[in-house]
Curated annotation (Swiss-Prot), chain B:
InterPro entries the UniProt entry points to: PGGT1B-like (IPR045089), Prenyltrans (IPR001330), Ptb1 (IPR026873), Terpenoid_cyclase/PrenylTrfase (IPR008930)
Biological function: Catalyzes the transfer of a geranyl-geranyl moiety from geranyl-geranyl pyrophosphate to both cysteines in Rab proteins with an -XXCC, -XCXC and -CCXX C-terminal.
Organism: Caenorhabditis elegans
PFTB repeat ranges, renumbered to this chain: 74-115, 122-163, 170-211, 218-259, 266-312
Gene encoding the protein: ggtb-1
Protein name per its UniProtKB record: Probable geranylgeranyl transferase type-2 subunit beta
Record-level GO BP terms: endoplasmic reticulum to Golgi vesicle-mediated transport; PERK-mediated unfolded protein response; protein geranylgeranylation
Keywords carried by this UniProt record: Metal-binding, Prenyltransferase, Repeat, Transferase, Zinc
EC class name: transferase
Amino acid sequence: MSDSDIPSSTLYKDNVDWKDITPIYPSKEEEVAVKIAVTEDFTDAFAYFRAILIKNEKSDRVMALLEDCIRLNPANYTVWQYRRVCLTELGWDLKKEMRYLSDIIQESPKNYQVWHHRRFIVETIGESAVNDELHFCSEVIRDENKNYHAWQHRQWVVRTFKVPLEKELTFALHMLLLDNRNNSAYNYRYFLMTLYDKTEDASQLDIEINLAKKFIENIPNNESAWNYLAGLLITNGVTSNSDVVSFVEDLYETTPEEKRSPFLLAFIADMMLENIENQKSAEESAGRAKKLYKDLQSIDPVRVNYYRHQSLLAQTMLIKAQTKVTAK
Amino acid sequence: MSFAGLLDFARKDVDLPQNSPNELLKDLHANFINQYEKNKNSYHYIMAEHLRVSGIYWCVNAMDLSKQLERMSTEEIVNYVLGCRNTDGGYGPAPGHDSHLLHTLCAVQTLIIFNSIEKADADTISEYVKGLQQEDGSFCGDLSGEVDTRFTLCSLATCHLLGRLSTLNIDSAVRFLMRCYNTDGGFGTRPGSESHSGQIYCCVGALAIAGRLDEIDRDRTAEWLAFRQCDSGGLNGRPEKLPDVCYSWWVLASLAILGRLNFIDSDAMKKFIYACQDDETGGFADRPGDCADPFHTVFGIAALSLFGDDTLESVDPIFCMTKRCLGDKQVEMYY
């Protein structure tokens, strides 16, 4: 673009269409209290925004002003709030608003306000917005696979509009195949199970456990997969599923010592703690737990204090178990 | 061995540059905070109008923790904060802006730091907060209706600091928090949302204020938090994310509230935080080599204070304020 294409000033104060508005600049006191350097177009646009708020004007030109304010500061919730009021009152084209929002979100995907605004629009449009919305979430997630807002927004869409379970499980699986360590995707599968009342459903639990095992086999040093596996067993404990116990023990046996992941060792140690509590070969289990925590101190030294604490816990639990037996 | 197996131990982390600072540059930070207004552009976003009261709290608190509060102009700041009060009883980020719980808490914190809380009206503030509590116990941040466990902490902390905790329905607030408690021991923003260090800090802090920490399995939560420490010593917010100074605060404060601060390797942690200092301008960045800002500066200093740095004031892990200024407003905790 050559210089001649740019208007001499893009400021509102120089724009004839805004001549009827008296801008409200920050007061001297405000400036003194917290001195802040902002650009001229920032000061200009927000001076007109303040004036509009007081005048309570809702119009097409205000919508354009709000877009400028959002561009300058997308985290300002007052601007967004006012935009919602205007949208409703002006009967604004909501599809157009969605396209506008998609652009903004692509630019600043971490902003709370934008997502909240999007939710408001989807709610207003209703059912017919669902497919586009899922597609949009997928796109943002493909760009940044742990984007907290996008996953959370997708949960909201699925919950609000009862999107079928299978379809969403497939989406989460797809994301996990692209990145076995994507904690957001594991969390999403668990969310789906909770939503569709499947956390105690034996066949669904088996599917999930097998999935976790597969991903652990593929990359044993994967915190999320191990946490997912432990989470699936939370009701009855990590030793409650014999299939999992033998899977973990086999993995330990078949992996050369120097290649064993800290998560593998910590998981077995947790199994041992559970054995002590259940008075299942308590002494032997405590001995093994302490040995594992000792190994963990050398292979994962940054958590040495944590493993020491756990080792002491194993000892404490053992003494508790033993005194319980004696008391019988 | 599979291809993925080759990447077996490739956790996400950063390298600390060799010439990184290796001690606390306390005086530089005080200058950084004190002079930020002269340093244009780089961090004006943080002090922009829409979050100015929060920005004031970060700066004032950083100075209080550094024992340099006298360098801030008390009267001007107190008057500005008071000017952010709205007729609904809450505080906005700047005069004329809508009230929001985030800024209401920051306003209350700033007034307490300057020993001026009597200038605020505790009754109207707590009524404002109460008005944002929903039937399921959650809190909206403002009238736009966004729910987040962050706002539960804001509400409970604000009312506690004003001696008005009983204004809120604490039982239902706790019930909502527990719906956000995940099987990995962490908490998310809403029921079903992924565990995140920042949200854990909010939920654990709120439970501590409510006197209901026994609702959770402390060891499970603390274990998840311990695994946030990367080999560089820094702490991340979620598995497989890069470490960041502000997570140092959220993770450490949560562990301190749970009585498990020792799960962290403090020497490695300090080394990481020191390396995030800008040794020319002062201030802390999110990671070594990035641009410093007041947000990461206050949380970097607060994190170091949790480890008992003598040159700093002692910080309270729930409220992120000096224990000195909190006095008897500190929450008693039993482990």
